[in-house]
């Protein structure tokens, strides 16, 4: 299982509440349809004023090739472009991980 973890910070023109609403209601449903995506979670800080980012997204794919194909697809490009409308993508941190489940 390959996981892409991304930290996101809201753009300067959005409040945390606007960012969270847009993410949940607009962006997440779009990204949820990425080809090959098996699991998708997003977490928001309980105290956004003291957090260093506004969301942590985790997208799970069967392997790295499937993940790369998903983001190379037309929908993948649309998801990336949409993220740029509400988040500071230059500040986003991305890491690709191979996950081992210890407790489920």
Question: Which residue ranges define each predicted feature?
Answer:
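Macromolecular interaction modules
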Residues: 1-104
């Amino acid at each position: 299982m390959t996981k892409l973890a991304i930290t996101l910070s809201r753009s300067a023109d959005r409040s945390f509440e606007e960012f969270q609403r847009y993410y949940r209601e607009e962006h997440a449903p779009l990204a949820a349809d990425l080809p090959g995506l098996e699991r998708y979670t997003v977490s928001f800080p309980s105290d956004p004023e003291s957090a260093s980012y506004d969301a942590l997204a985790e997208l799970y794919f069967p392997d790295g090739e499937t993940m790369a194909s998903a983001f190379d697809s037309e929908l993948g490009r649309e998801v990336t472009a949409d993220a740029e409308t509400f988040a500071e993508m230059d500040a986003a941190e991305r890491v690709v991980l191979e996950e081992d489940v210890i407790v489920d």
